[in-house]
């Protein structure tokens, strides 16, 4: 059965890295007999330029009917003072598709260990996933700003916590069978509920070990002993901070993919880096995050584990051969890096 993939190339280096990702997908698809159609739609700044809105109606309708969505990058300086900004499109599509779970793998590549700000012994064996609740919590609560007083409401229901917990435990079943739930249970009421629901959900997964960490302790462990983690799950605010902290461990944003999942609808896959308008159009952008996002899509939306592993192994091999883009300390262009990965498939 042919799968429908909606592509949102967006802005800046987005079209360049999307082309790279689709080139790799095309090669892998021929090897694993994966049939798909691509439906390219404007989004972000490209949506504003085309139709005056970062999430045009036709783009949203296509996304809703897709089997998966690939997003490259959005934003740029031309929109800094605009009344409508590209980032509003990302918030809107998350809301419209109910993308409640953000998944960010954190892995250290042997060939890139020297880029990490941590000592080699600290990052040895680091391979974990941050699962962030994306649609609840303080970001979506009421925000009240008065003359000399302000407050923000942090609100979570047991059902919201339960669904993100179950997602984390299911991911852990396919990995190291360990979940670290992060909260601030010693202070916050929402965290007391968070921990209670985590304990309840853990009973549904007897093969997975659950541990609790306070967020301040977890932030320290992520630097002093990150290899301790397998699957980290936490609420929106803590996840926003900790996922960004974790992203510095590999020493570059250029090799980190991510996914955002709904309960029953399509998932969205994207690199964690931005649109890099300063190098757009020069053919020097690092496509690896986009290519690994394609691998995540194959595994998580289509259960094509073989295809995902082919891509991941090809990326490993390419880096080990010393083929590096400029952000990684080499001279390879976007096209050269992509061609090398395709060759190593």
UniProtKB/Swiss-Prot annotation:
Site label Important for catalysis, positions: 139, 184
Q: Name one GO biological process term.
A: L-leucine biosynthetic process
Q: What does the entry list as the binding residues for substrate?
A: 94, 104, 132, 216
Superkingdom of this protein's organism? Bacteria
Give a GO cellular-component term.
Answer: cytosol
UniProt-annotated binding residues for NAD(+):
76-87, 274-286
Q: Which Pfam families match?
A: Iso_dh
Enzyme Commission number(s) from the entry: 1.1.1.85
Q: What detail does the entry give on cofactor binding?
A: Binds 1 Mg(2+) or Mn(2+) ion per subunit.
Quaternary arrangement and interactors, per the entry? Homodimer.
Record-stated family: Belongs to the isocitrate and isopropylmalate dehydrogenases family. LeuB type 1 subfamily.
The protein's name is 3-isopropylmalate dehydrogenase
Which species is the source of this protein? Streptococcus thermophilus (strain ATCC BAA-250 / LMG 18311)
The root-end lineage is:
Bacteria, Bacillati, Bacillota, Bacilli, Lactobacillales
The gene from which this protein is expressed is leuB
